[in-house]
């Protein structure tokens, strides 16, 4: 296992050989706040739309995020913050680029379907499912809880990526227009998505997946890398996925990020 302190306040451990990654968010640092400020627009709208559409300002993006966020249950809020953290951290630590956006384009709700879809340096697709939770049961073993989250992610990504809901791919195909600038790359990615599409006669059923867990627990006891590796070994032995990455984030609470986003909206409205 190698450690990496690329972002202050985050102790990052990686086992690249076994595709195991853990972010211990020990402090909601200025680095992480700056990442939210610089990346939220592109995460929410897509980098193309965030660049080309002047109405997609940071303040308006915060506003739209909070419109969806503040009416939700605590569990849904944990999920939204967990998905935001995943969007922020995976591309920072792994050489992957998101081709999907975070916002629900049709309604004032959370995104349906794939949480995030990425491409790697070879333009292979990676389907990511994020599951968050963990701060309600004070006595539950953190490793057991983390593995439960990963198992939930596995169940959902299997259902989504191998299921017949064509709208899931249709949504990502639209997102590609908002996330990729290069025309040729855009066409190549759409062709790959079409191969996985349920309406394709000779549909590809081989998937690269990322199972991401966001565990809200105090860091006096940390997710064990060895447990994560053993869990991945068991999943690999099932031969369900072509490629498999496990990416776990441990943070004490989601509230500090919530308060920061609210303060940013308030601040920009009074400037």
Region spans (language model):
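Short, flexible beta-strand-to-coil junctions
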Residues: 121-122, 204-205, 212-223, 249-250
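Interdomain/boundary linker segments immediately adjacent to catalytic/signaling cores
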Residues: 1-80, 84
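Amphipathic alpha-helical segments that form well-ordered structural scaffolds
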Residues: 84-93
